[in-house]
């Protein structure tokens, strides 16, 4: 669910939250495609351009991206569940939440070999830790601590670092989904430069293909020689995921 939510958040095509932003939105639309790509308006009978309702995303961003989740038994955020869900498509997240008990601050950052979290818990409050892909031992404020999901931290400021059990640092190679390659100018430019025959792939197919770029090229009858394969993977490996 988190992967799909991030896709909706970051996509500039419909259905995607940034589709509205790309078309000039400064408030939430009733329809996420209230303006068509050609500039035409959707059905005026249901086409408010200031319609903050179920299409809003900030609650999801605070609860799941930042990880600040209230607990019903402790109203007012006196106790929270800290369960952030980083995604490799974003390098970092910073958030603040002012509650009746004080200010919470949550930050995370993805590096090549670690997940790094910063959490500020206000006075008289506590947080249950539910960390993503955490190993049995994590580092809290520079010291090693055994990690158990649901362990509680009292009020204070914490820096949590660990090497996750799965990789969050995105690397591009021939197993990258074709849709990702064709939707990024840098990846596509290198592909066309090194494998010019890729230009013959039908635009509709390239834009919707969820299989790997290797599978798409094979299905299109395009074969890479060893030199092309090595040059392409070397060029893609040099691209930082957040530069795209």
What is each stretch, according to the model?
Residues 3-169:
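Non-catalytic C-terminal accessory modules of carbohydrate-active enzymes
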Residues 11-16, 197-198, 239:
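A short structural micro-motif
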Residues 170-231, 236, 242-243:
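Compact, charge-rich alpha-helical regulatory domains located at protein termini
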């Amino acid at each position: 669910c988190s992967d799909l939510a991030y896709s909706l958040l970051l996509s500039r095509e419909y259905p995607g939250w940034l589709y509205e932003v790309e078309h000039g939105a400064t408030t939430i639309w009733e329809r996420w495609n209230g303006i068509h790509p050609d500039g035409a308006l959707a059905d005026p009978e249901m086409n408010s351009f200031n319609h903050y309702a179920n299409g809003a995303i900030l609650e999801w961003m605070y609860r799941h991206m930042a990880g600040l989740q209230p607990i019903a038994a402790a109203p007012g955020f006196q106790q929270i569940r800290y369960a952030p869900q980083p995604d490799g498509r974003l390098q970092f997240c910073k958030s603040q939440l002012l509650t009746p008990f004080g200010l919470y601050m949550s930050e995370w950052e993805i590096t090549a070999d670690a997940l790094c979290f910063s959490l500020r818990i206000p006075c008289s409050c506590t947080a249950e830790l539910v960390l993503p892909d955490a190993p049995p031992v994590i580092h809290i404020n520079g010291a090693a601590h055994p990690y158990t999901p649901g362990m509680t931290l009292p009020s204070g400021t914490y820096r949590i670092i660990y090497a996750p059990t799965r990789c969050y640092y995105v690397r591009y190679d021939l197993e990258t989904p074709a849709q990702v390659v064709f939707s990024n100018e840098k990846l596509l430019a290198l592909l066309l430069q090194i494998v010019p025959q890729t230009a013959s792939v039908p635009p509709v197919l390239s834009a919707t293909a969820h299989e790997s770029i290797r599978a798409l090229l094979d299905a299109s009858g395009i074969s890479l020689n060893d030199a092309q394969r090595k040059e392409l993977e070397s060029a893609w490996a040099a691209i930082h995921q957040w530069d795209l």
